[in-house]
Amino acid sequence: MEPDTTRRSACDRCRGQKLRCVRLPGPAREDSPRSARSVNQPCERCKRAKVVCYTTKPVSRRLPQSYTRRRSTAYADDVMHSEVDLDEGMIGSNRLRDEPTIKRTPPAIADRLAHDPFPTELWSGLDISHASLDSSAVLSHVPDPGNMVESVAAQRANSNTLPSHQHGWPEDPHGALNYFEERAHDLPDVMSVSSPTDVRLGLDTVDRRPAAATSRTNQAIHSDTVNMHSQAPGSGETSERGLYSRASNTVADAAQLCTTQLSELNMRLMKDIESTTSFRQGMSAASDPNYPASGLGETSPSSSMVKFTNTMLANCQSFLDILQRLRSPTVELRGSSNSECSYGDLEYSSNEYSSSRSQSRNHSTSASSRSKDGRISAGGGLQSVLNSDTIGLSPSLDPIKADSSALDFSAFLSILSCYTHILRAYDALFTEILEMLMESSCIQLDLKIHNLVPEVSLGGFRLSGHGDLQIKCLLHMSFIILEKIESMLGVNAPEKDPYGSNGGLLNNSQLRGLLEALYHQKEFDYIRADGTRAARVKKTMKSIQRILDSI
């Protein structure tokens, strides 16, 4: 068999054009064992065209017998140091094929042109001077392998590319091997190429890694995949328990904030109630016929009533906002029979938004539950959103963990205290208004209460100066406010609510008795002066309404 360097007789130019190449063979050069071109005389066609005539050595498809596995840091525990020895022949014949795969000019050409890209025998027959065939100028488009690897690594590391003479590794083959061996773990990460243990054979890839290392790698990848899927949301029971945890933390934070706001509101209400004696004395003085009408201005006794009315309405607004936030978690997910959650099944449990109060329920939210730390959860309040029966999720989840988000007993007492102070404020205000109506005429009423509810207008009509209209507006608005507060608290809820969806925050077995003893109204026909405060306030409001209708 002829040598590898001469078994392909046609030059690359003639072979690419599928033409017959006619030339005389010449002696091979002994000083260039790694040359990619056989040293022959130029063929007739290349000589006439005045181009370089060369023949590329075909790539061998056989692995050399001296091939040994190169050690990689990923498999350092499985490959011994004794297996790292590479002979000089292996470095010369398979060096470029063991390097990471990079898109470039065929490596055999670039590597074997490093010594002498234009031998004398190739250009001696051409009318081209040797100076014009400077390798650095003519082959500037052919990248050097060392510069190529370094430039790619430098671009990935945001550093400047070094010239070929500043690559940093020794010129000795064994020294260069040790240099790359110490930095082998940087090549796959920086250049994003396959492992050096993969040998490229044409279009096929042979994995030379040990079987044990391959199995351990597959197990590690499988475990990472399992961990990733286990942490992904929406994966069965884990995601459902995560939903409970996130909902429980959110509701607990909201409950703590509402408890703090209730305490602050309670202190403000107590302070405002103490100021009722001042405006009562002022209104008593204003009801005196000897009191001059000219004194009814900013310094008149009615100004204290106006200030008290504005403060009371602002406190009612704050109290309603807090109650609304406490009731907002009672959005129930009415799931289908297979426990699937649907947006079309959302139903709000508050009185003003509920559209199906008469629908039957399979559970009672009015029944309260006590958590491990002794806190009470209000029926229909924060607890109902976290019941496994209420939320359309898997019934296998444990609803006991939801007790941590329930309000404590001090929060319920703050709610009762705020409601008590609001009733006292309304009682004091409407009692004074009723006394003025019974003692004064409509004209005197306009003089005494000329701006009870300031900055109120209906379209283009302003209520300033119309005392009777302002009182009617205040009556209707106050009545609606009290009804809304009582609805949220559960004051007027039935004693035996089989479903409990509209029971309110305080309508449960622990607080029901206290609520009834303090504020539960009786029928108005049986109420006298010694009736409860809530019933007395509403009775006073109805009396004022009858007087205003008769004027």
Swiss-Prot record:
<feature type="region of interest" description="Disordered">
    <location>
        <begin position="280"/>
        <end position="302"/>
    </location>
</feature>
<keyword id="KW-0479">Metal-binding</keyword>
<dbReference type="InterPro" id="IPR001138">
    <property type="entry name" value="Zn2Cys6_DnaBD"/>
</dbReference>
<dbReference type="InterPro" id="IPR036864">
    <property type="entry name" value="Zn2-C6_fun-type_DNA-bd_sf"/>
</dbReference>
<keyword id="KW-0539">Nucleus</keyword>
<dbReference type="GO" id="GO:0009893">
    <property type="term" value="P:positive regulation of metabolic process"/>
</dbReference>
<keyword id="KW-0862">Zinc</keyword>
<feature type="compositionally biased region" description="Low complexity">
    <location>
        <begin position="351"/>
        <end position="369"/>
    </location>
</feature>
<comment type="function">
    <text>C6 finger transcription factor that positively regulates the cluster that mediates the biosynthesis of imizoquins A to D, tripeptide-derived alkaloids that serve a protective role against oxidative stress that are essential for normal germination.</text>
</comment>
<dbReference type="GO" id="GO:0003677">
    <property type="term" value="F:DNA binding"/>
</dbReference>
<dbReference type="GO" id="GO:0000981">
    <property type="term" value="F:DNA-binding transcription factor activity, RNA polymerase II-specific"/>
</dbReference>
<dbReference type="GO" id="GO:0005634">
    <property type="term" value="C:nucleus"/>
</dbReference>
<feature type="DNA-binding region" description="Zn(2)-C6 fungal-type">
    <location>
        <begin position="11"/>
        <end position="53"/>
    </location>
</feature>
<keyword id="KW-0238">DNA-binding</keyword>
<feature type="region of interest" description="Disordered">
    <location>
        <begin position="351"/>
        <end position="378"/>
    </location>
</feature>
<keyword id="KW-0805">Transcription regulation</keyword>
<protein>
    <recommendedName>
        <fullName>C6 finger transcription factor imqK</fullName>
    </recommendedName>
</protein>
<dbReference type="GO" id="GO:0008270">
    <property type="term" value="F:zinc ion binding"/>
</dbReference>
<keyword id="KW-0804">Transcription</keyword>
